[in-house]
A protein has these predicted regions:
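Residues forming the flavin
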Residues: 1-174
Length: 174
């Protein structure tokens, strides 16, 4: 076991809190896979640019300096019937659907499995490919959180347009 983003786990924390009489609940994090930017064909994805002028949140932030920076672009990609078929064919392998994981998931960010099952009438679901930072090749595929096994996640990822050769840096987890 590990913590988020490769951090060390907080071993025995739950047991310690339980001994103190604090009731615990499990919340599912709904974290998507991370992919290597250079392995994705960005030219096949829709560009999602930021605002032309960025208004700072704080009076202490210099708006001129902030707006002189080059913004990092996001991209939009959509799931497709092949993606949905892979998910439907592997629902029994999902800890969330097999009952191995119990917990409350994020209200507005369902896993991709949940989207495919709950919104079966939709032929596609919008995903956002977001840079994790300026100095990293790591990209975050927002809207694609999953509890599927790694090999299923890899197949799901490869089914997306522009992701046929995508390298997964970190798997998604529930």
């Amino acid at each position: 076991p590990s913590g988020p983003d490769g951090m060390l786990p907080a071993r025995y924390l739950s047991e310690s809190l339980d001994r103190l009489g604090i009731s615990l609940r499990r919340f599912k994090t709904g974290t998507p896979a991370r992919v290597l930017r250079s392995s994705v064909d960005l030219n096949r994805l829709e560009r999602q640019c930021g605002e032309e002028y960025i208004t700072p949140y704080s009076y202490y932030t210099d708006a001129t300096e902030l707006n002189s920076r080059t913004q990092s672009e996001c991209r939009i990609v959509y799931t497709n019937e092949k993606t949905h078929e892979i998910i439907r064919n592997n629902l029994g392998r999902s800890p969330i659907y097999s009952g191995r994981i119990h917990g409350t998931g994020p209200r507005y960010c369902p896993s991709i499995e949940d989207k495919v099952v709950r919104f079966a009438d939709k032929s596609r679901h919008q995903l956002f490919l977001e840079p994790m930072g300026r100095d990293t090749e790591e990209m975050y595929l927002q809207g694609f959180s999953s509890s599927m096994p790694e090999e299923v996640q890899r197949a799901m990822l490869a089914s997306l347009e522009g992701f046929e050769k995508a390298e997964m840096m970190r798997t998604a987890y529930a």
